[in-house]
C-alpha cells in the first residue's frame, strides 16, 4: 500500500507541475528573437523590390503563421513612410503613424525601432507596454533589424525585467 500512495502523490505532483513547465517553455528567449528577426529580415529583403513585395509583408500579418511563436511575434515598421507595415497580433496598428504610437510612459517606441536603419547588427530597445490582459505597462525589450537595403525594420520583443540593453547587445554580437 505505501508504494501505491507514493505513486499517487508523485503522479499528482507531476500533473500539478505541468502548467508551470508549459509556461516556461512558451517564453521566447533573446537568442530565439535574434535568430527569428534575422530570418525575417532576410525573407522580407528578398521579397521587396519584386512583384512579390506585398506577399512579403503579408506573411508577417498571419496570426497562425511562422513568424508568431511562443509568446512573441515579428512586426514590421516602414521607416521610409513612418508607418507600421505588418503586425500579426494587432492588425489595427497596420498603416498607423509610427511616430504617434506611444508606450505607457509616453515614448514613441515604434519610431525608435527605426534607429536600426543605422546599425548593421540591429538594436535592442526597451519600452513599457501592457502584458496581454493587463492595463499597466511592463518592461518589454525588442530586437530590431533592417531588412537588407530597404526602409523596413523587422522586430520582435519579450517582457523581461532582468536583461540590460548592454547585455543584449553583447549577445547579439556573439550570435553573428
Q: What annotation goes with each model-predicted range?
A:
Residues 2, 8, 14-176:
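N-terminal membrane-sensor/transducer module of prokaryotic signaling receptors
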Amino acid at each position: 500500500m505505501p508504494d501505491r500512495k507514493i505513486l499517487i502523490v508523485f503522479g499528482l505532483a507531476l500533473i500539478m507541475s505541468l502548467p508551470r513547465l508549459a509556461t516556461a517553455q512558451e517564453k521566447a528567449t533573446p537568442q530565439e528573437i535574434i535568430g527569428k528577426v534575422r530570418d525575417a529580415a532576410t525573407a522580407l529583403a528578398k521579397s521587396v523590390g519584386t512583384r512579390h513585395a506585398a506577399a512579403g509583408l503579408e506573411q508577417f500579418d498571419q496570426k497562425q503563421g511562422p513568424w508568431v511563436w511562443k509568446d512573441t511575434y515579428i512586426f514590421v515598421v516602414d521607416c521610409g513612410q513612418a508607418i507600421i507595415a505588418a503586425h500579426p497580433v494587432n492588425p489595427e496598428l497596420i498603416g498607423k503613424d509610427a511616430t504617434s504610437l506611444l508606450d505607457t510612459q509616453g515614448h514613441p517606441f515604434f519610431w525608435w525601432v527605426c534607429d536600426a536603419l543605422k546599425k548593421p547588427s540591429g538594436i535592442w530597445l526597451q519600452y513599457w507596454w501592457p502584458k496581454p490582459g493587463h492595463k499597466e505597462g511592463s518592461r518589454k525589450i525588442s530586437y530590431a533589424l533592417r531588412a537588407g537595403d530597404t526602409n523596413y525594420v523587422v522586430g520582435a520583443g519579450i517582457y523581461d525585467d532582468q536583461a540590460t540593453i548592454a547585455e543584449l547587445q553583447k549577445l547579439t554580437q556573439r550570435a553573428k
